[in-house]
A protein has these predicted regions:
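Flexible, acidic glycine-rich loops studded with aromatic residues
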Residues: 569-577, 582-783
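Active-site neighborhood of glycoside hydrolase catalytic domains
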Residues: 477-592, 600-605, 610
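Low-complexity, acidic Ser/Thr/Pro/Gly-rich terminal tails and inter-domain linkers that flank the onset
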Residues: 23-44
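Asparagine-centered strand-capping/turn motif at beta-strand->loop junctions
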Residues: 38, 52-58, 489
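Acidic, contiguous N-terminal accessory segments
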Residues: 24, 131-316, 572-580, 761, ...
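Short acidic, flexible loop segments centered on an aromatic residue
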Residues: 40, 58-89, 128-131
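Short, compositionally stereotyped local motifs that mark structural "simplifiers"
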Residues: 216, 737, 741-841
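Feature activates predominantly on carbohydrate-active enzymes
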Residues: 264-484, 490-509, 513-517, 699
């Protein structure tokens, strides 16, 4: 039975205990326990305790340092404490003995309680990846050893309430109320498809479908026909040939009979007399038709042995229907990335945006700049980052561990294979190299290159250097880095970027794939950068720049020009063309940059940014954090991994998105309070007629700070991505004009039923992980009531404090229950939900 909890615990074990692919070194004779004592002891702090135990047979002297990773927080050090915790950068910490430390005898434990700023909300916030480095009698560091951490997460009755988080905790009552919306039966047949076709007309009668299929196609559709044949064979066990059989599938060329914005994706399907005719004017359209056909056949397998005769007419409303995957923070291996491409193609998503570089790693080979992958694609124990980068996000000390998501990159050959595979499935891959901020990995790699050559060839050492060693600037990035911004006044910086861009262009060319867009990041450049660089001051004088921030505009202007000369559209996060005060940066008004609008939090005035840009003439992709950041936790529950700074995101929040009425897209604010959607747009900037034309698409984001396995990527995707896929294809739902009325709720219930009845079984059949919605439980008049948003799920519960399993009591009807603590789970298609807890007071 696969659960998110089991996946998390399994991956946590790998993070804490795992070593390299070779011989595993012995674990340390130390162990740690981390306890959250109380969340938000004061307005800004939570209290937590580290317990260090000596499991060896000798006293533990002061010749050790323990390193670990944790979501960036600020530890408040106690006075005269025996231990101290120091942040080495972002998520990387060390714990070491102070002058008040006394040797720890065998079998003894030292307890260290400390206040930390922020609040811990779930499993993604705990310490991970601990290891110890000891020194011998001469002070020489010995090989690192793993230190297991036991996590004593939360005492729910203590930690669930936070003074700074009024969002309701997802306990039994919370889920019961949520699930009540879906308790009524919904009529949902095999024509419930994602995304929904524009028009489905039943023409009467049915056509049988035989496992023996004759596949015919026009020459223009040969590649799509071969792929369809492969999918019919592998997914539906069909015997496909070109001989006449009872079932005939034909792919035919046609002229698009209507005016639509994206005629290359238009298609029709006609089913009649056991003949399934797919028609389109373009290969992309016929591919879309094939995906709809496969979905119909999947649904047919669940409900019938025949297909209704029908005529489907379909096309998308948005030309950009994308997913951004961060492979920099934690890596996604090539095989898993190809699986993701298949998954996206099922639902007619047509853009895969790969975040290939960031502060924590660089993930694509650049011939001639080997240090980017030899050093910056690996993380492990280091004091100078000359061989690898510091550890981050749970993976510990071993930079040679090929199973760790800390380590890895796409070789040139790998990347070209990915491009070809995506092209076959009509998915465009947009590479992102994030600059000038979020560039620490590249900076450290080029610093190491400098050190390698400086004694023998100064010119070669400085050729691609990205930092001014004399720069005294002090700054702190959003992720707590102090050294992650490249120096934009150095010629070597531009030489480096030209080299990187040209090598990536060459990979596309050699793969036979057109590179149409290149994402340059441009986000979260902190205040204080470049102020202490004499190189920058001289550069400003020479180029007539008056403010430090002008350097960023100058730099990005050069990069946009670099791409324009290569006929590549520049893409960037909204930060490129927005000023810090959320006004439009007029400097880029005439640029062609495509803007990803992400920081759209209403409480910070960010919800108006997309329409400000669109109205000003900038093309916009809606990436709204509150709707489409898929790595946000599903809900406020300790077992649900993910972040929450932008709110909680589930499959209903993605469904709620209204691209042309964006202010009505969120139904709760950051505090968890209900939003009056009717009044949400009052006083906000409306979308103009010109602005309407500049909304080019939607994109969901999966940042990987909290990712510990590819199964977790899938867990974040499903079922959240269904709302994204649906809204990108059908931008104006039937309920758009009455977003709080009966039409909205009826459509939402049908949406949920389609996911439960057809899409989750489809995913299970293909071995794709997904989240099972937890059951609701409550007591009334001494009876235990339960419900679920998944009618076919089995609910099991316990009353003794233990975790429910497949052998626990099954809830079927209200039952007498006076237990003070009740736990329940939903079981469905070989998977199970997180645990629902109810304190029955």
């Amino acid at each position: 039975m696969i659960t998110m909890r089991n996946i998390w615990i399994m991956m946590l074990g790998i993070c804490l205990f795992g070593c390299g692919a070779g011989k595993q070194p012995p674990s340390s004779q130390l162990s740690l326990t981390w306890k959250l004592e109380k969340d938000s002891v004061e307005a800004r702090y939570f209290k937590n305790t580290f317990c260090l135990t000596n499991n060896g047979n000798k006293s533990l002297t002061n010749n050790w340092v323990i390193y670990f990773n944790q979501t960036p927080i600020y530890y408040q050090q106690p006075i005269n404490a025996p231990l101290e915790i120091e942040c080495l950068g972002s998520t990387y910490y060390k714990m070491y003995p102070t002058e008040h430390y006394q040797a720890l005898p065998p079998g003894e434990t030292i307890t260290f309680t400390i206040l930390s700023e922020g609040n811990v909300i779930n499993v993604s916030s705990v310490p991970e990846g601990a290891y110890v480095v000891t020194t011998d009698e001469k002070g020489k560091p010995l090989q690192p050893q793993n230190v297991p951490i036991e996590i004593e997460l939360f005492k729910p009755d203590v930690q669930w309430v936070s003074s700074r988080n009024s969002f309701p905790y997802a306990d039994g009552n919370y889920f019961y109320k949520q699930n009540d919306d879906f308790s009524k039966p919904v009529d949902c047949d095999m024509l419930s498809l994602f995304p929904a076709p524009k028009k489905v007309e039943k023409t009467g009668g049915v056509s049988s479908f035989s496992q023996k299929v004759c596949l015919k196609f026009d020459d223009a559709f040969k590649e799509e026909a071969l792929l369809l044949k492969s999918q019919l064979t592998s997914l539906l066990r069909c015997n496909v040939s070109d001989k006449d059989e009872e079932t005939i599938i034909e792919l035919k060329k046609m002229e698009v009979p209507i005016t639509c914005q994206y005629p290359d994706e238009y298609y029709e399907i006609v089913i009649k007399n056991n003949r399934l005719t797919l028609k389109a004017s373009d290969t992309h359209g016929i591919f879309n038709a094939c995906q709809t056909l496969l979905a119909l056949l999947d649904n047919m397998e669940l409900t019938s042995s025949s297909l209704p005769n029908l005529h489907i007419t379909d096309y998308p409303d948005m030309g950009h229907r994308g997913i951004m995957l961060d492979v920099a923070r934690n890596f996604t291996k090539k095989a898993d990335l190809l699986k993701l491409i298949d998954i996206l193609s099922f639902y007619k998503m047509n853009v895969l945006h790969l975040h290939l570089s960031d502060d924590e790693a660089w993930r694509v080979e650049i011939p001639g700049l080997e240090e980017l992958t030899e050093i910056a694609s690996r993380r492990g124990h280091t004091t100078d980052e000359q061989m690898c980068l510091y550890p981050a996000y749970a993976w510990g000390w071993n930079e040679t561990d090929t199973t760790s998501l800390a380590n890895g990159y796409y070789s040139r050959s790998d990347f070209m294979d990915i491009l070809k595979y995506a092209k076959e499935r009509h998915i465009r891959v947009i590479p992102e190299i994030d600059i000038p901020g979020h560039s620490r990995a590249a900076i450290k790699a080029m610093n190491a290159r400098y050190q390698k050559y400086i004694d023998t060839d100064q010119s070669k050492a400085e050729e691609y250097l990205l930092t001014d060693f004399a720069d005294t600037s002090q700054y702190l990035s959003a992720q707590n880095f102090t050294d992650n911004v490249i120096n934009v006044a150095m010629p070597s910086t531009y030489h480096f970027l030209e080299k990187v861009i040209d090598e990536i262009v060459r990979m596309y060319q050699d793969a036979g794939v057109e590179l149409t867009a290149f994402h340059v990041g441009g986000d979260e450049v902190p205040e204080g950068i470049w102020e202490g660089s004499s190189i920058c001051r001289t550069f400003m004088q020479e180029n007539g720049l008056t403010k430090i921030r002008d350097l960023k505009d100058y730099f990005l202007e050069q990069i946009l020009e670099m791409l324009d000369k290569r006929n590549i559209q520049a893409v960037g996060w909204q930060d490129i063309v927005m000023n810090p005060d959320n006004t439009v940066n007029e400097h880029f008004r005439n640029s062609k940059v495509l803007n990803y609008c992400w920081n759209t939090i209403p409480e910070q005035g960010g919800d108006e940014v997309p329409y400000k840009l669109a109205n000003a003439g900038y093309p916009v992709i809606l990436c709204n954090v509150g709707n489409f950041y898929l790595d946000m936790a599903y809900c406020y529950h300790v077992e649900e991994p993910g972040l929450r700074w932008g709110g909680y995101v589930d499959e209903y929040v993605t469904f709620d998105m209204l691209p042309f009425d964006i202010y009505k897209s969120l139904r709760r604010n950051l505090k968890g309070e209900p939003v009056d959607v009717k009044a949400a747009s009052n006083g906000k900037q409306p979308l103009t007629k010109e602005g309407y034309q500049n909304i080019k698409g939607l994109s969901g984001q999966i940042w990987s700070e909290t990712i510990r396995s590819f199964e977790q990527v899938e867990y974040y995707l499903f079922p959240k991505v269904f709302g994204l896929a649906e809204r990108a294809w059908n931008v104006q739902p039937s309920w758009a004009l009455s977003p709080d009325g009966k039409v909205y709720m009826d459509t939402k219930r049908k949406y949920n039923a389609g996911i439960i009845d057809y899409e989750l079984p489809r995913l299970a059949k293909r071995g794709i992980n997904f989240r099972v919605s937890p059951p609701g439980i409550m007591t009334r008049d001494g009876l235990l009531l339960a419900n679920t948003a998944i009618p076919n799920a089995v609910i099991r519960y316990t009353t003794d404090g233990s975790e429910p399993t497949e052998s626990s009591i099954q809830w079927q009807t209200p039952v007498v229950c006076n237990a003070p603590l009740i736990k329940a789970k939903a079981f469905y298609l070989g998977k199970e939900s997180v645990t629902t807890v109810l304190f029955n007071r």
